[in-house]
């Protein structure tokens, strides 16, 4: 991306929520966005997910240029998926897990069956009977695993992760991060991780941006991430 500028309305005017001069993320890389609340990190993720369209600049995603003010079309709708901090953002509380997992494939006209859904669940350490449960019958860590499985149903090339472990206790956080690390090795997909926690980003990412008040404060490579996390 080049000269990305994201604005929001404020009263009768606008304010700039995010400015990035240039950013390039390689295929198969895990890239981190670090910052506090209101820093602009989640704003960037929403632009890349097609959820926020009021921006200016040049953005190319998986080889395809994005157009401001336009919804994703074609392959991008399948190739870009997102995992939220709150799994209920993608899991309907009144739907069994079976329905939530088959929905992405059903909407896109792709085949699905219980056997493939069970295999997906077992791959992330969840038993087959999870299909018949409701979200509230699962622990927070189990719900997040289901949300990850749902995001992977369309075999995306880019997985956007918005604070996926911040609501979990430390042990479960480590389990989810290790799961994401293993999935990345297996699939080769690109991941972009948003987090306020330096250690979380250092655990998973190759490089990162440190963002504050909508501006890039620091560009961090693997060594810098490890050093800052060690001193955190």
Task: Go through the PLM ranges and name each one.
Residues 201-203:
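A short, surface-exposed alpha-helical micro-motif characterized by mixed small hydrophobic
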Residues 34-36:
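The feature captures the beta-strand-to-loop junction immediately N-terminal to the Walker
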Residues 134-138, 142:
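Conserved ABC ATPase signature
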Residues 49:
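Helix-to-loop junction immediately C-terminal to a conserved catalytic motif
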